[in-house]
Regions:
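Charged, amphipathic alpha-helical segments and their flanking helix caps
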Residues: 1-33, 39-132
Length: 132
């Protein structure tokens, strides 16, 4: 299986297919919303029959909190299961991330929140991506 960094980059490549969404394969130093970044949540070692690891990532999406209604509408588009801005749909369009994994599935939206990132408030949520 691919390395964690290769998988991060594969997920980030899928984020690149969403128009006007800034993205990075790691937690960024600077955010200009809307922005999505990839972080590893968990690795389960040797779970498949051939000894491969299963890795769970989260794609964190940040949108501007300047106008609450606009923020919620914008975030909802990224969290939807379908649509031009859907992160799940972008991952589903290439579930092998360019043939580097057996599967990558966006499974859960969680932890919708207002969060401070480098001192600025954003509306945010995580999309869990299971990879094997």
């Amino acid at each position: 299986m691919a390395t964690v960094q290769e998988i991060r980059e594969g997920i980030d490549d899928r984020l690149a297919t969403i128009a006007d969404l800034r993205h990075s394969p790691v937690v960024p130093g600077v955010v200009n919303p809307p922005h999505a970044f990839v972080k590893r949540r968990q690795t389960t070692f040797g779970v498949s029959m051939d000894g491969e690891d299963d890795v769970t990532f989260a794609v964190t999406v940040l949108v501007s909190w300047a106008d609450q209604t606009t923020a919620q509408e914008s975030l909802d588009e990224y969290l939807a299961s379908t649509g031009a801005k859907s992160i799940k749909a972008a991952i589903d369009a290439d579930p092998t991330l360019g043939d580097i994994v057996d599967f990558a599935h966006a499974t859960i939206v969680e932890d919708e929140r207002i969060t401070a990132f480098y001192g600025v408030d954003y509306l945010a949520a995580d999309i869990v991506v299971e990879v094997g």
